[in-house]
Design a protein with these regions (language model features):
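Polybasic, low-complexity RNA-engagement segments
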Residues: 1-15, 19-50, 280-432
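A short acidic, Gly/Pro-enriched loop at the edge of an enzyme's catalytic core
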Residues: 102-105, 167-178
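Conserved class I S-adenosyl-L-methionine
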Residues: 104-113
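Conserved SAM-binding loop of SAM-dependent methyltransferases across substrates and taxa
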Residues: 114-127
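Helix-to-beta-strand junctions that scaffold the AdoMet/dcAdoMet cofactor pocket
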Residues: 125-126, 222-224
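S-adenosyl-L-methionine
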Residues: 134-172
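Mobile active-site "lid"/loop adjacent to the S-adenosyl-L-methionine
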Residues: 139, 176-217, 229, 233-240
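Class I S-adenosyl-L-methionine
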Residues: 172-174, 209, 227-230, 234-327, ...
Length: 432
């Protein structure tokens, strides 16, 4: 069995008492792995009919499945690159369902990287409402951006700031907030030996201090009647019950709806803590909608691209940042005082006398919204050639073409003289 920190074992024994030995025995078992379906791109029925992997339903989420990584590698399947599913630890999938997201909700993911909760929220919103996906760590935010881009949504703003600045911008604004708080990571011990090496009790207390600050700021951003879900992937009482109980005691309008621990000896998962809080007190909201400059001549090259290569006309909610053109969410809040990575959907880059579509746009559009689609079957080696950055011989000269796998757009190519030049981003190209 793996060697676990002595102080950690002492504390868990106090919490679990008679179940302690059963908990320890769970470390002799393999880690659990899961994937979660993006229902904006493929229905559960169609996904299951493909019969790609030996999947088992995860009981606490309709879109989640267990898989055995010794038998299959979903991360090396083109459907993963297409954003059809997201690889996520199974017990972590228990968090977002507690939010009870409704279409049109305004939602905040305060500690979002690498994107597990945010991608789940986007699929629940189904291209309605708004998600503000925040990550304070500037290194981790790049992975967040890539994962959200792959899921294909226009209603998401990605910010890179701390909870205090968020609170000052969004007081009383959100219907739902999730805080997957930075923690000591005790629930990662079985799958990541580095987490064991990094663990100290002082880290537990350091995380607790940060968690208390984040939940206070998060609560201020909820509107009356709103729901806040707090979660960690750790087992310490200090970072879980103690944080929640102190917060509830300090806030008369905060009501604890439920709290739950998922232990690895009780469920098939690595472990999680989840608490659901409702806000009953009023909060004065002064968030203003972003004022957009009407763009006409500035986007003529985009409109020309749209006319030639798309079957839709996107509404005129455009924003220019340098040469980058964005389609911003409806009723987009003013976020000018925050560091913003993405203002909604990045459409592409306006260059001299032409428009170059973004990778994000290919993931957002449905195949019927694109004039020219080169569909490739999942079992055709050509799709791997495309993902590696190779050209594809098509025999046509249609200009901008969306490459799709099983009817799901996965990226762009530009076709001339019978050859499709590859525009799949170099940083995303596969090595296998």
């Amino acid at each position: 069995m793996i060697s676990l920190p002595e102080k950690f074992l002492e504390d868990v024994k106090v919490i679990l008492q008679d179940e302690y030995e059963e908990f320890i025995d769970s470390y002799n078992e393999n880690k659990t792995t899961g994937l979660r379906l993006n229902t904006m791109k493929m229905s559960k029925e169609k996904f299951q009919k493909l019969n790609l992997f030996d999947l088992e339903q995860i009981p606490w989420t309709n879109e989640g499945f267990y898989y055995d990584e010794s038998v299959c590698k979903p991360g090396k399947n083109p459907l993963h690159e297409a954003g059809v599913y997201y690889l996520q630890e199974p017990s972590a999938m228990s968090v977002v369902p507690k939010l009870d997201i409704q279409k049109g909700d305004r939602v905040l993911d305060m500690c979002a990287a690498p994107g597990g909760k945010s991608t789940y929220i986007l699929s629940q919103l189904d291209d309605t409402g708004l998600l503000v996906s925040n990550e304070i760590n500037p290194i981790r935010i790049n992975a967040l951006g890539e994962n959200l881009e792959r899921f294909g949504a226009r209603n998401c703003i990605i910010t890179n700031t701390d909870s205090t600045r968020l609170r000052k911008t969004f007081t009383g604004y959100f219907d739902k907030i999730v805080i997957d708080a930075p923690c000591s990571g005790e629930g990662m011990f079985r799958k990541d030996p580095v987490a064991i090496q990094d663990w100290t009790y002082s880290k537990v207390l350091e995380c607790q201090s940060i968690q208390k600050e984040i939940i206070r700021d998060g609560y201020k951003m909820l509107k009356k009647g709103g729901i806040l879900v707090y979660s960690t992937c750790t087992f310490s009482r200090e970072e879980n019950e103690d944080v929640i109980e102190e917060f509830i005691a300090e806030n008369e309008g905060a009501v604890l709806i439920e709290k739950e621990r998922l232990w690895p000896h009780k469920i098939k998962g690595e472990g999680h803590f989840v608490a659901k809080i409702q806000k009953l007190d009023d909060e004065d909201c002064r968030v203003k909608e972003m004022k957009l400059k009407k763009l006409n001549n500035e986007i003529k090259e985009y409109r020309s691209f749209e006319k030639k290569f798309l079957n839709i006309n996107l509404d005129n909610r455009f924003m220019l940042r340098g040469d980058n053109l964005y389609l911003v969410p409806d009723e987009c809040p003013n976020v000018e005082k925050l560091k913003v990575l993405r203002y909604g959907l990045h459409l592409g880059v306006l260059k001299k006398n032409r428009f170059e579509p973004s990778h994000a746009l290919s993931h957002y559009l449905k195949p019927e919204q694109i004039k020219y689609v080169q569909n490739i079957e999942l079992n055709d080696e050509t799709i791997f050639d495309y993902l590696r950055g190779n050209v594809i011989n098509t025999g046509e000269s249609r200009g901008w073409v969306a490459v799709a796998v099983e009817g799901i757009p996965i990226g762009w190519g530009k076709e001339s003289n019978g050859v499709l030049k590859n525009h799949y981003p170099k940083g995303l190209r596969i090595k296998y």
